[in-house]
Amino acid sequence: MAAKLVVKGIRKSFSTDKGPLNVIGEINFTVDDGEFVAIVGPSGCGKTTLLNIVAGFVRPDQGEVAVDGIARYGPSPKGIVISQQGSVFPWLTVQQNLMFGLNGHHPDKKALADRYASMVGLKGFEKGYPHELSGGMLKRVELARALVVKPEILYMDEPLAALDALTSLQMRIELRRILAEERHTCVLITHDVEEAIHLADRIFVLSARPATIQATFEVPFPHPRHLLSPEVVGLKAAILREFGL
């Protein structure tokens, strides 16, 4: 399978009053077309910085990121970011939020927005405003707004971190269902090992700062994945051992 995303020799440091702060050591990895990769690591190790570099929002000091074999030095039009903070416009309805990113001349914008609202379980809420929705429903709006523009790559930075455990689990199940219907390459940053196992095809474990990839785990289990199955429990234990737990 062809590589969709190639990260080669990435390094990054920031200037501080106490001198350079080395955040990212040398990191190399590839993500195949249609693959779901999760990146986990200790708090403050540079996960978000790494994602911002991969997504094109931060320039590395060394190395390069290539999408479809072409080096990128800024955000790729083929990708879109879903963050923990959220990006729903409070003055727009669900339908209007979904239509916002579509080209002004896109035919049937409303029909397309309504289709994706239905896909993420928001049928009947198209005319609702964000303040009328729960946290889980708002996250569904964000997901639908990302998907409606048909990105080839989804960059996700702790997208479910603000949700309660049950809602987070429901959203994981919804996301896997959608990805079974539509092909997207995904890069997920998360502190939640179970979330990574539940969603990903491969998991990269980052070291403490300056971050490097200290371990890679394949996740060969079919979906749906049961978090209490012996295989999943065993994989979780192996990943946690990388953190000394």
Each language-model region and where it sits:
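Conserved ABC ATPase "signature" region
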Residues: 107-125, 176-177
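The feature captures the beta-strand-to-loop junction immediately N-terminal to the Walker
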Residues: 40-42
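Helix-to-loop junction immediately C-terminal to a conserved catalytic motif
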Residues: 55
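A short, proline-enriched helix->beta-strand linker immediately N-terminal to the Walker B motif
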Residues: 148-152
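Conserved ABC ATPase signature
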Residues: 129-133, 137
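Conserved ABC transporter NBD signature motif
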Residues: 63-75
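ABC-type ATPase nucleotide-binding domains, specifically the catalytic core motifs of the NBD
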Residues: 15-17, 92, 96-111, 119
